[in-house]
Amino acid sequence: MPSRKHLANAIRALSMDGVQKANSGHPGAPMGMADIAEVLWRGHLNHNPSNPEWADRDRFVLSNGHGSMLIYSLLHLSGYELSIDDLKNFRQLHSKTPGHPEYGYAPGIETTTGPLGQGITNAVGMAMAEKALAAQFNKEGHDIVDHFTYVFMGDGCLMEGISHEACSLAGTLGLGKLIAFWDDNGISIDGHVEGWFSDDTPKRFEAYGWHVIPAVDGHNAEAINAAIEAAKADPRPTLICTKTIIGFGSPNKSGSHDCHGAPLGAEEIAAAREFLGWEHPAFEIPADVYAEWDAKAAGAAKEAAWNAKFDAYAAAYPAEAAEFKRRVNGELPAQWEEKANQIIADLQANPANIASRKASQNALEAFGKMLPEFMGGSADLAPSNLTMWSGSKSLEASDFSGNYIHYGVREFGMTAIMNGIALHGGFVPYGATFLMFMEYARNAMRMAALMKVQNIQVYTHDSIGLGEDGPTHQPVEQIASLRLTPNMSTWRPCDQVESAVAWKLAIERKDGPSALIFSRQNLAQQPRSAEQVADIAKGGYILKDSDGKPELILIATGSEVELAVKAAEQLTAEGKKVRVVSMPATDAFDKQDAAYRESVLPSDVTARIAIEAGIADFWYKYVGFDGRIIGMTTFGESAPADQLFEMFGFTVENVVNTAKELLA
């Protein structure tokens, strides 16, 4: 029977061979962490390679995602549908083994990692979801939600600020099922880290309230195993500090940055094989090694045992069992569509001139009563973002049965934690901050879009309408940057009806994130027919039309729709034929068929004006070079909002005069 070291060496061999064949990649971390991975995956990780979606599996996250050959090797050896040919195709076009682990490619990859610090933060979200789902569904004698979240991370993850945001909150919330392994190898791309990373990491994590196990020999299986056992027994999140040698097994490059991010080279790989006693050719794993690694039988037995537990739970609590299945499968409640549409119709029939942030809260109130899977939150701005509703109950370390997370001032951490919650399953996460501060969180929203996971962000205080707080808090280019992100759905509604439609579609959207952008100031509700209400979902629609063919089209979003309508009324009174198009979601409009887009924006009507209190340049796509844009070309100013709108040209007079110049 192969020794544990020999089993770990299988990871080392596959990792150095995969990087060498691709002629790019990072062999150092996989070779350094192979012993830890062998102990965790063969001795502790509850998973089933034949069903990577098993609801109560342990989650494993490789936060130092550049070491991707580590997880690819583990998945292959354990029996997942990842062949040796897939490993040979490492970093190649359309392979299941891209340079950094990507969710949705290889089975068993729980999240896309690579931007350092986000993996550990996703893992915090997964651990929060596990604890909340357990609190909501487990009954005495029936622990149907009971799994750990394990994460590997390196020095780079800990240097990134997001690791502070996430790990601080994890300690506060007592996430005892979260176990992190710090790959303390002292090396980063630039060399030995003591010149730029001299933190006392164990004390840092003790200060967060974590259980810290220091100075574990990362190449000693017994020490690693003992640390994991101690971690599992402690009610706090655990940091296991593993001292490792980067590139372990490479005689001439281990312990240095030379093996961090480049192939070892054929000569050094041969030397490593000799040093490790690994006598097999590249990509060849002997049968006895495969046999020891294969987790399919054990995984199937573990899942079968859980299925029996769930059957007993379902017999005792049939309603809860059905609800658990619905939520884990990501299905919306029965009659959702009918009830949601009625809510929207009622809003149209009962006009209210309110801020769209208040309209958002009203939508939460209406929809939330149907959605126990809601998991809300805000980055310490709940009274401003209006993200709490009557059914909101805050999560606390001692009581995780609620549905609202106080993230504190942690925009980046919040957004990446929400990605983890969404990836775990069982919840529809929403979070919030001022639109300006989405900048802190932009990369986590990009990751949500890349992974195609549901992440609903409420961004309030959406323009110079914020007023006196000034340009540090007034967004200008942020809406455009969200719209330009692939697979991001971005909504800027003009009233309570568009706001409710935006919320409904964000709740229904399972294949990507949604940015819902709301105003601080009150907005007038617009009259609409039932057909117009239905057309809101198309992202752009005719709100007010001319008698006969229009000679001018005004396109507006959010708070500027009311302005466009008033300007159109004045122009119409002067004999102009003016159409007003409300375009709350350009991405949704762009997805409509050509016939619909042409019906809203006829190509032969070139006199067009776009009006939005955001960066002007975005709108040339819709108005053309012959059109005009009333938008922002500079940062804002500190002053009352009404003065700012006048100063920057968001007035009926300016729209009317611009229209007359265009039509002259």
Swiss-Prot record:
Q: According to its UniProt record, which residues of this chain constitute the active site?
A: 411 (proton donor)
NCBIfam families, per database record: tktlase_bact
Q: Which family does it belong to?
A: Belongs to the transketolase family.
**Any one GO biological process:** pentose-phosphate shunt
Q: Which InterPro entries match?
A: THDP-binding, Transketo_C/PFOR_II, Transketolase-like_C_2, Transketolase-like_Pyr-bd, Transketolase_bac-like, Transketolase_BS, Transketolase_CS, Transketolase_fam
What residues does thiamine diphosphate bind to?
66, 114-116, 156, 185, 260, 437
What does the UniProt keyword field contain? Calcium, Magnesium, Metal-binding, Thiamine pyrophosphate, Transferase
Q: What is this protein called?
A: Transketolase 1
Q: Which residues does the record give as substrate binding sites?
A: 26, 260, 357, 384, 461, 469, 520
